Design a protein with these regions (language model features):
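Substrate-binding cleft of secreted/luminal carbohydrate-active enzymes
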Residues: 61-152
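Polysaccharide-binding and catalytic clefts of secreted carbohydrate-active enzymes
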Residues: 2-62, 68-75
Length: 152
């Protein structure tokens, strides 16, 4: 049925992509039937997520996505945040909001640059994983005020 490496067989890849998407679709329908919004923290960039973990999240019907754009995990600088956000926003094409999920220790030394990369490439907002200190939260508030961005 499969070649010696099923993970490289396109029919197996499609099976995995479809299986995960079907589960997400069932959950999404149940949540939305109850009048609630639904979101998920997903792997970064739709193309990377498809390849790495078989998440075809660009085709899901969620209200918001929080791609985990942990640039340090992939040995990338803050510019990678912008590229990942841009791909994500383009893929969802206005159907949902994209909030860049940032690993705080990865961006601590390039805090404002990382935020610029997210917002300048279309992120509706950001979420912090392994959260910032109060000092950085104050810097974040000042950044939002300076850029004329509202807080929700």
């Amino acid at each position: 049925l499969f070649r010696s490496y099923p993970m490289e067989d396109q029919s197996w890849i499609n099976f995995r992509l479809d299986a995960i998407s079907r589960v997400v679709d069932q959950i999404t329908k149940a949540v939305k039937a109850d009048g609630k919004a639904i979101s998920a923290a997903v792997f970064p960039g739709p193309s990377m997520a498809k390849k790495m973990v078989r998440q075809d999240w660009g085709n899901w019907s969620l209200d918001a996505y929080f791609p985990m754009i942990y640039n340090g995990f992939y040995y990338e600088g803050p510019e990678w945040i912008g590229r990942s956000v841009q791909e994500s926003v383009k893929t969802v094409d206005g159907r949902a909001k994209v909030y860049a999920g940032l690993m705080f220790p990865d961006i601590k030394n390039d805090f404002e640059k990382a935020l610029d990369e997210a917002f300048d490439n279309g992120a509706s907002g950001v979420s912090f994983f392994d959260g910032p200190s109060d000092e950085y939260l104050h810097q974040f508030k000042a950044y939002l005020d300076k850029k004329g961005l509202k807080t929700e």
